[in-house]
Amino acid sequence: MLSPKRTRFRKQHRGRMKGMSYRGSHICFGRYALQALEPSWITSRQIEAGRRAMTRYARRGGKIWVRIFPDKPVTIRPAETRMGSGKGSPEYWVSVVKPGRILYEMGGVSETVARAAIEIAASKMPIRTQFIIAG
């Protein structure tokens, strides 16, 4: 699972996701990509599940780039705890994804293989996505 090696602060505010992604919205490394169409938090488990599904489908051929990184800690309070007494402890990491953001890229394979592999990865995501081709 992906997570930062160290962070400046243990806990973060939730924040809000408004507007489009103004960075990371163009294909940089591969030829095919999976682009987000909705805003959401994507957990490190979901990112890893999508990556594994793509690599398993593509087998040896091709290369995969993961363009998002979970750098936001999500805290959860223990079960049956009364309100107050501070914020809960960090439980897992998420990546804040806005519409237009590239999630995965793929290269070195045919379009049919890439489309099928990326479609499998898209089914692991909690948001609507689209398959795009560079150029």
Swiss-Prot record:
Q: Record keywords: Plastid included?
A: yes
Q: Name one GO molecular function term.
A: rRNA binding
Tell me which CDD domains the record gives.
Ribosomal_L16_L10e
Q: Which domain of life is it from?
A: Eukaryota
Q: Which Pfam families match?
A: Ribosomal_L16
Q: Does the keyword Protein biosynthesis apply?
A: no
Which residues are listed as membrane-spanning? none
Q: Do you know which NCBIfam families this protein is assigned to?
A: rplP_bact
Task: Please give the subunit comment from the record.
Answer: Part of the 50S ribosomal subunit.
Record-given protein name? Large ribosomal subunit protein uL16c
